[in-house]
């Protein structure tokens, strides 16, 4: 009898623990990098993995260059392979300008392609986490559901090294992907020199 009570108690505790561990997937609950320093963030970043949004998007060989001008304004250029009409691969150049918000890690990013067939828009650009020297995790939600979760998002895992992230950085990034409710939603980005 005592065994049955212990088993029921453990089952109840497990149920309580699992319900308390449910994630809050509302975009407003997502944390970003505290005390973000865009000057330290500037420089070259290689995209190692990405979660795609709806529509045409850079496929692979994605390299981004962030700069901060003398007035503190951040801008970026990115290059990567895009597949058009399901069979035509081209290297696309993208340009972005950033508007600061109250949170130093949250920006509005106006972007456009150098070629007219590329997308343009004005998306959120959040730096979720970075150590500035090894890894960075970017997130953008283009459209919210009524419940505050994201209907159309994209995200990049960046590395300063084109060969990838060290294991300790991979562990941090994986946890932050879970925090964004995007675990197992990313695909690896190859860097094979297509746009070199």
From Swiss-Prot:
SUPFAM superfamilies: Lipocalins (SSF50814). PANTHER family: RETINOL-BINDING PROTEIN 4. GO terms for cellular component: clathrin-coated vesicle; extracellular exosome; extracellular space; yolk; yolk plasma. Its main location: secreted. The keyword Phosphoprotein does not apply. Disulfide bonds join 25-181, 91-195, 141-150. InterPro entries: Calycin, Lipocalin_ApoD, Lipocalin_CS, Lipocln_cytosolic_FA-bd_dom, Retinol-bd/Purpurin. Pfam families: Lipocalin (PF00061). It comes from the Eukaryota. It comes from Gallus gallus. Keywords: Disulfide bond, Retinol-binding, Secreted, Signal, Transport, Vitamin A. One of its GO terms (molecular function) is retinol binding. Interacts with TTR. Interaction with TTR prevents its loss by filtration through the kidney glomeruli. Interacts with STRA6. This is Retinol-binding protein 4. Residues 1-21 form the signal peptide. GO terms for biological process: eye development; gluconeogenesis; glucose homeostasis; maintenance of gastrointestinal epithelium; oocyte growth; positive regulation of insulin secretion; protein-containing complex assembly; response to estrogen. Retinol-binding protein that mediates retinol transport in blood plasma. Delivers retinol from the liver stores to the peripheral tissues. Transfers the bound all-trans retinol to STRA6, that then facilitates retinol transport across the cell membrane. Belongs to the calycin superfamily. Lipocalin family. Gene3D superfamilies: 2.40.128.20. Substrate binds at residue 119.
């Amino acid at each position: 009898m005592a065994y049955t009570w212990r088993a029921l108690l453990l089952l109840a505790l497990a149920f309580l623990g699992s319900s308390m561990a449910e994630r809050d997937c509302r975009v407003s609950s997502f944390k970003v990098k505290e005390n973000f320093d865009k000057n330290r963030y500037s420089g070259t970043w290689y995209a190692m993995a990405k979660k795609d949004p709806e529509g045409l998007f850079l496929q692979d060989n994605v390299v981004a260059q962030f700069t901060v001008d003398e007035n503190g304004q951040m801008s970026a250029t990115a290059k990567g392979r895009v597949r058009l009409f399901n069979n035509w691969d081209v290297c696309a150049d993208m340009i972005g300008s950033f508007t600061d918000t109250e949170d130093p890690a949250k920006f509005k990013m106006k972007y456009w392609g150098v070629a007219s067939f590329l997308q343009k828009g004005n998306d959120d650009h959040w730096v979720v986490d970075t150590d500035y020297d090894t890894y960075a995790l970017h997130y953008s939600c283009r459209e919210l559901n009524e419940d505050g979760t994201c209907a159309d998002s994209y995200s990049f895992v960046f590395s300063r090294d084109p060969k990838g992230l060290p294991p300790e950085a991979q562990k941090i990034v994986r946890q932050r992907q879970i925090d964004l409710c995007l675990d197992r939603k990313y695909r690896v980005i190859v860097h094979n020199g297509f746009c070199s």
